[in-house]
Amino acid sequence: MARIAGINIPPQKHAEIGLTAIFGIGRTRARKICEACEIDYAKKIKDLTDSDLEKIRDHIAQFTIEGDLRRETTMNIKRLMDIGCYRGFRHRRGLPMRGQRTRTNARTRKGPRKAAASLKK
C-alpha cells in the first residue's frame, strides 16, 4: 500500500483517482501531478514503482494539503468571524453566506426543521 503525505492510497485504484484520497487534491490536480511526473494516470497505484511514488511525493510537497490546508481554512473562517463582517456573521449563525434564500430551503446549513409551536387555547 502506497503512503503519500501521511495517507494510505488504495492500491487497486488508478493513480488519478487514488491521489484524490489526499485532502486538497481533486481530479484535475491529480491528473496534472501525474502529467508533471510523467506517469500514466490510468496506471494502478500498486503498479507504480518506488521511483514513481517518490516523484509524486516530491511534486505534492509543493502544495498545501491535509492538516495545513484544513488549519488554513479554519483560520480564514475564524478571521472572518473576528472582524465581524457579513460572511463571518453568517458563519457564526450557521446560515448560508452567498445570498441564497433562507425563508424556505437552506436545510443543509440550518439543520433539521424545528417543530412550530402550536397555538392551542
UniProtKB/Swiss-Prot annotation:
Encoding gene per record: rpsM
Keywords carried by this UniProt record: Ribonucleoprotein, Ribosomal protein, RNA-binding, rRNA-binding, tRNA-binding
Name this protein carries in UniProt: Small ribosomal subunit protein uS13
Stretch list, region Disordered: 95-121
Organism per entry: Polaromonas naphthalenivorans (strain CJ2)
GO molecular function: rRNA binding; structural constituent of ribosome; tRNA binding
SUPFAM superfamilies per the UniProt record, alphabetical: S13-like H2TH domain
Gene3D superfamilies the record matches: 1.10.8.50, 30s ribosomal protein s13, domain 2
Source lineage: Bacteria, Pseudomonadati, Pseudomonadota, Betaproteobacteria, Burkholderiales
Subunit structure: Part of the 30S ribosomal subunit. Forms a loose heterodimer with protein S19. Forms two bridges to the 50S subunit in the 70S ribosome.
PROSITE patterns registered for this protein in UniProt: RIBOSOMAL_S13_1, RIBOSOMAL_S13_2
Keyword Signal in annotation: no
GO biological process: translation
